[in-house]
Amino acid sequence: MGAIITLSILALVVLYLGLFKAKALLLPVSILGFLVAIGFLLNDWTADKGPLFSGMVHFDHYAIAFSVLCIVVTLCIFIISKGYFDEGGQVAEYYSLLIFSLTGAVLVNSYHNFSMLFLGIEIMSVALYILVGIRKRDKASNEAALKYFLMGAFSTGFLLFGIALLYGATGSFDLDEIKAYVVNNPHAISPLFYGGILLLIVGLTFKVGAAPFHFWTPDVYDGAPILITSYMSTVVKVASFAGLLRLFSYSLLPLQDFWEPVFLIIAIITLFIGKIGRAHV
């Protein structure tokens, strides 16, 4: 949990550094904050305290590994893109919004309750809606931001509807209780539950960019600033996959025979469309 708090404070500190024109401190302070967050995560690796805050988040080895990966990739993007940042006049805003988005990614990696999954995805996405369209005079950037916002809202609707159906069937947002429902009722699972699983797959594969829910990615990646595209194609996808895997490899693992063919079809379609539909090499 220390990593989430550190990143949240870091985003605010960076924003205030920009307010006071301390541009030279932005990168060093960001790097220091990232290292502190990684330190908290590595400390949690040897001291697993179980689900925290009434089961809202759980920093197990799975969450820590994906969170460290997200932070390291973001750190590399910051270092490599220093010259890119210096060219613009909104340096602090770039840094701060990316760190806020990273905070959401860490939440998605470590959620143990559907409310935290939703909160993490929204924190991660809302910052990116702004960053994709941050070039106000660039029509391609504005178009990409609008498409990303509309598709993001569309996918969030599927995600929330799926969560609502699972809650209606189980009476809980907690992953442990959802798993207990599946284990204890192998032959009496509500049809609502199966419908909720399918809607969750749709909502989460939108975030991952898997076919046939990938149609927003070419325009958004092409119109967004290259730095933001780099972040979206790495950190956002890692966090989205982590959130997807946590749910289906833990709570819904007993229903593998139901959802495995769905993912197999999605994987085949994604590989097929990606192979024959590419326009740029």
Provide a role label for each language-model segment:
Residues 1-280:
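Alpha-helical transmembrane segments of multi-pass membrane proteins predominantly involved
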